[in-house]
Amino acid sequence: MPKKVLTGVVVSDKMQKTVTVLVERQFPHPLYGKVIKRSKKYLAHDPEEKYKLGDVVEIIESRPISKRKRFRVLRLVESGRMDLVEKYLIRRQNYESLSKRGGKA
């Protein structure tokens, strides 16, 4: 079975030899057909610590490196897409403010 290869944006590089990659996907709703966006964060192994916040990277499935790390960074696709990171941070900030007030996201 081939290994999964995903493309996403580095949203955190604060850990040693690890980056957090946000992968967004789109798919049509099974009944209504509306295109839905979903995102997921993956921890990826970066042994040389060369990928920075905002980089668009490809990650590939690998052996388990730690409890949550199951991917490693394959290559850099595009450098410094800070607009995508800012959009993610604003969305996260809005979600946190709603959860503090007791509202639903």
From Swiss-Prot:
The keyword rRNA-binding applies. The keyword RNA-binding applies. Keywords: Ribonucleoprotein, Ribosomal protein, RNA-binding, rRNA-binding. One of its GO terms (molecular function) is rRNA binding. CDD domains: Ribosomal_uS17. Disruption phenotype: Increased generation time and a temperature-sensitive phenotype. GO terms for cellular component: cytosolic small ribosomal subunit. GO terms for biological process: translation. One of the primary rRNA binding proteins, it binds directly to 16S rRNA where it helps nucleate assembly of the platform and body of the 30S subunit by bringing together and stabilizing interactions between several different RNA helices. The combined cluster of proteins S8, S12 and S17 appears to hold together the shoulder and platform of the 30S subunit. Belongs to the universal ribosomal protein uS17 family. Part of the 30S ribosomal subunit. Contacts protein S12. This is Small ribosomal subunit protein uS17. The lineage of its organism: Bacteria, Thermotogati, Deinococcota, Deinococci, Thermales.
